[in-house]
């Protein structure tokens, strides 16, 4: 029981620490990079959304040109960090966390490794657990017993997501977004319409633990 309590306290501390950073320090970092790049940040309230595929959307009373500049800046400098801090402070279950974060990590890995030519949608897993649909060399490494730790992690995530997809589909995972509202030089996290829909039943969680 003592270990459980320590872990819970540590988890709460890390969540509070990240929440504090989001509220008090994130905007200063965004502003610093924007100034370096000569990008004007909006004076009015605006919003950043990052979906599980890594697509960034900027909303607010901003010109399309300015939206594109800010989107590119966020993509190049903050996207992964913003996703990580959001998902770690969001009010979601462990199962939801593992599913949506697994999808994000698989997508980012595949897109970066293939220069955006492939995505999770291209992946197939047969009854023997063999992964196909990606470039031949990548599939060979992914299916090898000698794959490095990163490839093993991606492979396990692919198995988990494929199992979930076969049981429930991916619509609920794809609807999840990391949302940030920026107003008066303050950043705060905001929920989006899809963030409460990821299935979280005991039966699936029990099965999930046996395949990862």
Where are the predicted features?
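Type III/flagellar secretion export determinants
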Residues: 1-212
């Amino acid at each position: 029981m003592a270990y459980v309590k320590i872990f819970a306290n540590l988890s709460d501390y890390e969540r509070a620490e990240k929440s504090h950073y989001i509220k008090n320090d994130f905007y200063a970092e965004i502003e610093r990079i924007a100034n370096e790049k000569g990008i004007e940040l909006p004076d009015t309230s605006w919003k950043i959304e990052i979906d599980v595929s890594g697509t960034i959307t900027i909303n607010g009373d901003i010109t399309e040109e300015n939206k594109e500049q800010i989107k590119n800046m966020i993509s190049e400098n903050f996207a992964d960090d913003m996703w990580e801090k959001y998902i770690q402070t969001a009010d979601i279950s462990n199962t939801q966390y593992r599913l949506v974060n697994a999808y994000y990590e698989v997508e980012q890995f595949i897109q970066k490794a293939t220069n955006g030519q492939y995505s999770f949608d291209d992946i197939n897993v047969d009854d023997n657990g063999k992964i196909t649909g990606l470039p031949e060399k990548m599939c060979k490494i992914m299916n090898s017993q000698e794959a490095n730790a990163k490839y093993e992690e991606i492979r396990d995530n692919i198995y988990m997501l494929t199992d979930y997809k076969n049981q429930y589909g991916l619509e609920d995972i794809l609807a999840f977004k990391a949302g940030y509202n920026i107003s008066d030089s303050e950043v705060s996290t905001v929920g989006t319409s899809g963030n409460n829909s990821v299935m979280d039943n005991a039966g699936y969680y029990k099965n999930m633990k046996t395949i990862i």
